[in-house]
Amino acid sequence: ADRAMARHLARARGRVVNVSTARVPGANFPTVTADLQAAAKLAIEHLLDQGFRHFAYYAPMNLSFVEDHHHSFVKLLEERGYTCSLLHAPGGKRPDKQWQKQQKALERWIRDLPKPVAILTWTGRRGREVIYACRALGLSVPEQVAVLGADDDALLCGTCIPPLSAVALTSEQIGFEA
């Protein structure tokens, strides 16, 4: 979303409601989105119930709503006496050579994390990258490295081996109800 789109929507007939977690500078539309703090809390409760005591977060940090989710996750962990390691994922699409370079950096990061560890990722795509890195390192998922996505893309989650678990943000339902 950008300013040109916001201007176009402001001139449109009818009501405009932003159902995206993305914020458009200068746009003043009513916004209805998923509760990212509640999603982070659900993730933490699930991971603690599974016995994990080491936590990490892997996501592109160039988007304000991802930063909000990360900060909620870290704050809630700290309130419970835990810390969280962070690896910034690159944003946008990457040529193959850049992907391979980033994947190696991801492998190094995961290798150095205390085990067992639970890694929360912003998207299923990032979760898949973590699962690939674990496979390359010979680490078992979810026994040594649990991977939990922050969005429930059923197709992507189901095609990962092993399947990726995710927190359902109910974004589609929010859009219909708005």
Label for each model-derived stretch:
Residues 3-178:
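Bacterial carbohydrate/catabolite-sensing allosteric modules
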